[in-house]
Amino acid sequence: QNIAGADRRMSYAAVPSAIFTSPEVASVGLNERQAKEEGFDVRVGKFPFTASGKALAMGEAEGFLKIIADGSTDRILGIHIVGPHATELIPEPTMAVRMKMTVAEFARTIHAHPTLAEAIGEAAEAVHRMAIHV
């Protein structure tokens, strides 16, 4: 886009990674260690796929979803997924990191039931100790 005359800036903090293993792995943003090294007041919300009705019904309940947030601003710093269809679930977390969403904003996103994506909302609620399935 820049070569065509547009003035665009790339946010490398919001570039997802995907590993096509079994289970799949997907990640965007900072991990816990990186967030601590950068001086953030790190808060973590974690949701296991063993608590996901959809993952259990699929017979693919191995793994978890983890959200890393800044405790002082509630901003989402990173989201990491190990589990079924992680590479398909990472776009929504990528948007949250790119848009600098807060955990509270992200947790208010409605996820259809039963879906694997519900784990995203549950992990956000877990940051504030509000998850209902764990």
Label the predicted regions.
Residues I3-A4, V15, F20-V134:
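Flexible, glycine-rich terminal cap/loop adjacent to redox cofactors
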Residues A6-S11:
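Glycine-rich active-site loop/strand segments that organize a redox cofactor
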